[in-house]
Regions:
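Long, low-hydrophobicity, acidic/polar, solvent-exposed interaction domains
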Residues: 1-148
Length: 148
């Protein structure tokens, strides 16, 4: 399903965001860059379109895009997307991705939230609240099964 955005809640409450379709990723980045007065070259947009998900504040995006995928995925490089009441950048990403998908694919964007519901419930609840404030009330919750 290309009309899908995945919000991952990782250990420590870090939040990562990804959109399946590369063309929607580019349009989402363009909308975010307008909102936050950032600029990205065509090469940076292309590199961003290859990233399945990311988890940094918008002011660190340029630096993240420049890294190789190996360096990008090293422990501690991505600190998570801010999603608290003081700096709720996740709300901006959700809105931008919804608008981008509507523009590019003329369809509604579907959402999935990934995480360990038992351990990450407070953070997952914050993500659900962020979606519901934008009238996104239908989403998939994907939780991992752990062996005993």
């Amino acid at each position: 399903d290309t009309d899908l955005a995945i919000i991952t809640v990782a250990d420590g409450g870090k939040v990562f965001f990804g959109v399946k379709a590369a063309d929607v990723r580019i349009k989402t980045l363009e909308l975010i860059s307008e909102q936050y007065s950032l600029s990205f070259t065509d090469e940076e947009k292309k590199r961003f379109s290859l990233m399945e998900e990311f988890g940094v504040p918008v002011n660190q995006l340029n630096g993240l895009i420049k890294l190789s995928s190996t360096d990008r995925n090293k422990e501690g490089v991505q600190t998570g997307i801010p999603h608290d009441s003081l700096d709720n950048q996740l709300t901006a990403w959700v809105k931008a991705a919804r608008n981008a998908n509507a523009e590019v694919n003329e369809k509604q964007l579907n959402f999935a939230i990934k995480g360990d519901a038992k351990e990450q419930y407070p953070e997952i609840k914050k993500v659900i609240d962020i979606l519901q404030k934008q009238k996104v009330n239908k989403f998939n919750l994907v939780t991992g099964l752990r062996g005993e």
